[in-house]
Amino acid sequence: MEPSWILLAAGLVLVLLVVAWVLRSRARRAATSVPPAAPPGRVVAPGERLRRGLAATRQRLTAPLESVFGRAGGDVERTLGELEEVLVGADVGVATAGALVARVRERVPSGAEASAVRRAVREEMCELLAGTPAPAPSSKPWVVLVMGVNGVGKTTTIGKLAALHRQSGRRVLLVAADTFRAAASDQLAVWAERVGADLVRQRPGSDPAAVVFDGLQAAKARAIDVVLVDTAGRLHTRTNLMEELRKLRRVIAREVPGAPHETLLVLDATTGQNAVAQARTFSEAATVTGVVLTKLDGTARGGVAIAVRREIGAPLQYVGLGEGVEDLRPFDARDFVDALFGGEADA
């Protein structure tokens, strides 16, 4: 009997070692998706950070705009025609560029100098992009539903939003309702540990609505201030996606009257006009209250922000300008336009 017990104990130890190794490997894989904290150094002002993030887009616009606005004389129609072509080339989109130019045409008299047209363009962009900032939580729990296709940085954005709320002293709970992608749950777990947030998740393949229900029950029991709900991003199954989002919203509204208080759509700026198509599809499935535009620092397609705003009407509320936690910034229309054009408004 004694040898049998020894073998049994050895086998049990081996199993435990294997399980520990698997869990550690999964945690390491998830951790690679979490950006590092900013290195020590001087604090970069939000406007400067945005200017750096839009450098590629600005570089793409600078030479064509100088050609358009640097000309002497008052041929407004020629200036506007060339301006429209430049805007389309910056991923503002054909329809949005045309509408923007039409509004500028109404603001400037015929024979106006190119500098006057430039000022009018800036003002029209500011007015188009202006919107309400993300609201401060005013009830408890404050529920935020976050949508977006896989690969846009949705789960990372949720982690960074959690960090922002934690910096404001709020208790945060993350709900891993993207049960079709195991890595999403693991990644949220790493973020929860990193920023000091609670986490509710179930095994892969679970019913997302059940996960949300459990999360809201936990939020009420633990006196959580903010609940951030991750969702699946399977845009290729459009009908199922819409129905799933509607179901999640019904569960949320039933458990927390008036919720979701925010419905954020995360879009990847590097995808250009594809981001506009995604925005259109998601806005059909749920009312979008705000847009998060990620990866602005890695693309020359920053003009897509203007196209998305006009397409679905929802305000841009955050922009992603890098990998660090501090690189998710509240959106400011004036700062954005200044960064896009490369300086303060013309005198």
Language model features by range: what are they?
Residues 1-12:
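Feature marks short, highly hydrophobic, charge-poor N-terminal signal-anchor/signal peptide-like helices
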Residues 3, 19-20, 161, 277-279, ...:
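Short beta-alpha junctions and helix-cap segments that line functional grooves
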Residues 16-31:
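Cytosolic-side junction of a single-pass transmembrane alpha-helix
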Residues 27-52:
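Short juxtamembrane segments adjacent to a transmembrane helix
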Residues 33, 229, 293:
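Short beta-strand and adjacent tight-turn residues that come in two discontinuous sequence segments
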Residues 43-229, 244, 254:
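Primarily NTPase-proximal linker/entry elements flanking Walker-type ATP/GTP-binding cores
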Residues 187, 204-222, 236-345:
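Conserved catalytic-core segment of NTP-binding enzymes
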Residues 232-234:
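Short glycine-rich anion-binding loops that position phosphate/pyrophosphate groups of nucleotides
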